[in-house]
Amino acid sequence: MNASLTDSDQYTLSTRVAADQGAYHVSIDAGPYHIAYADVRPTCSSVELSVDVALGNAAPRLRRRLIDAVFDLDVMRTPRTLLATLPLGDVDLLDDVAQHCVNVHTRAAGHSCLVDGRLLG
């Protein structure tokens, strides 16, 4: 009998911290390839978030898993401004980010969606 693979069998979630800069890199990988990743850079008054998803690969549940991992970081649990850059047109990803914020404003910039909001904390 063939065993079917689940998300947890096919993909790995990893978080790496650049201690000298206080930046975080969260990724979902399939073997050596990034399926989706997020870079988080906190400052005194805000957090910059940049998310990228490989074309045609990441199901909505994987993107949600990535965003859940990002917002589980301690740095995302204090009320401050979120400045996020997401792939333009990825409404599932935008909705997942917006659930963690208030006063969300979006605008298009090239192939990106820029999101400003206030973290719930």
Locations of the language-model features?
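C-terminal "cap" of GNAT-fold acetyltransferases
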Residues: 110-121
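Conserved acetyl-CoA-binding loop-helix of GNAT-fold acetyltransferases
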Residues: 58-72, 99
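Conserved N-terminal entry element of GNAT/NAT acetyltransferase domains
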Residues: 1-19
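Conserved GNAT-family N-acetyltransferase fold
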Residues: 36-38, 51
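Conserved active-site alpha-helix within GNAT-family acetyltransferase domains
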Residues: 88-106
